[in-house]
Amino acid sequence: MARMKDSNARHVVNVPSTPIGWSAGKWGEWYPDLLGNDGKLSTTVPKYMWQDGWKLQHDRLLRAASAMTRGVPLFLSGDLHALAHGAIERNGADDFRRNPVHTVLTGPVSTGPRGWPSAARGTPPRVATGIGIKETLAPLEMNGFTIVDFLPERVECSMYRWKIGRPESELDGLQPFHRFTIP
């Protein structure tokens, strides 16, 4: 957190193993969310062995990222088997609208039919409970990857997608399906 506050680097990027902003009710996530009987994420049932410290560390990281005075507050992560982008404007009582924290699910390269969260967990990735996020791309369960270009004044992202079962000949002509710039 001190590095985010004191760094003179143009960009400081956080790359946690579990995503920031979205959940599928998995055990090791930052969030206490579980899939409820109504098909929505909920915190009414305690998640087995979940620790409050996970969310407290998440909250500290988001506060430090939003407080950065240089560069883009940015998290890149995978592990939800999806492609997505959003700007976190609220986390609980914390208001980040002045400097939203950008979060990107960079995509899985080889998930099969039973590996998608909607198949394995019964829910696609959803915005975690207590998070306010402006999504420019809601989580999309497709194989793919993200190319991130770091420029002095901005970050440009290009997302590519692929679905198993499509002809391999299409890979040579793969084009980005979603592009966005983070100023």
Sequence positions of predicted segments:
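Long, structured stretches of catalytic cores involved in phosphate-ester chemistry, encompassing
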Residues: 1-183
